[in-house]
């Protein structure tokens, strides 16, 4: 039996401000740092350890991973950073407030942009300063690999090659992996592992900072998955993610 641990980055500054973040490289809040430390505490209490770590090229995920490593005295572990684990690219919505967009366009439209499987948000234009071509961390990508926006379907298509070519072979070689990534790149992995339909994944919300542990058989079929820590707390944090775009609600601190 293999184990795989997934963790979404701790609260970021734009999570706090309730903005669409996507590939924008924002940092953790003090609460986000605390969430990462608490995630490390839960991992230690469960007796889990790792052989290597994987994350995106965005600092909120990288710093979450680094905090967890430091708390576990595992800063020496190899870390693989890859753009395929980045958050879903929210196109022209990046930087905009979710609640304000709900008030302007309606909650239903914003829900479709956030949670539908195959409907992308409005795209960036090629000359937009937010385009990945203006960021040297993506200098090795082809024009086709640089998104102007992404649906969840597009995000799944981006993430799965990293699963098949990197993560799955490492797990089957007996490596114990910790993956620190983002809400939608992790939704893509969970959808694949659990065989979820597009309708099922629409209702899936990944809470910040809580380690999700998979037990996998020799074919990497899940035998069990569960968040570490209190189940009710995990459900409450997942519900908070779902509430972010509602016009009549306020984002949690």
Swiss-Prot record:
Pfam families in the record: His_Phos_1
Catalytic activity: (2R)-2-phosphoglycerate = (2R)-3-phosphoglycerate
Marked site positions, Transition state stabilizer: 182
A GO BP entry: gluconeogenesis
EC number assigned by the record: 5.4.2.11
Disulphide bridges: none
GO molecular function, one term: phosphoglycerate mutase activity
Keywords, comma-separated and alphabetical: Gluconeogenesis, Glycolysis, Isomerase
Active site: 9 (tele-phosphohistidine intermediate), 87 (proton donor/acceptor)
Binding positions (substrate): 8-15, 21-22, 60, 87-90, 98, 114-115, 183-184
Pathway it works in: Carbohydrate degradation; glycolysis; pyruvate from D-glyceraldehyde 3-phosphate: step 3/5
Family: Belongs to the phosphoglycerate mutase family. BPG-dependent PGAM subfamily.
Complex and partners: Homodimer.
HAMAP family named among the record's database cross-references: PGAM_GpmA (MF_01039)
PANTHER family xrefs: PHOSPHOGLYCERATE MUTASE
Protein purpose: Catalyzes the interconversion of 2-phosphoglycerate and 3-phosphoglycerate.
Protein name: 2,3-bisphosphoglycerate-dependent phosphoglycerate mutase
Organism from which the protein derives: Oleidesulfovibrio alaskensis (strain ATCC BAA-1058 / DSM 17464 / G20) (Desulfovibrio alaskensis)
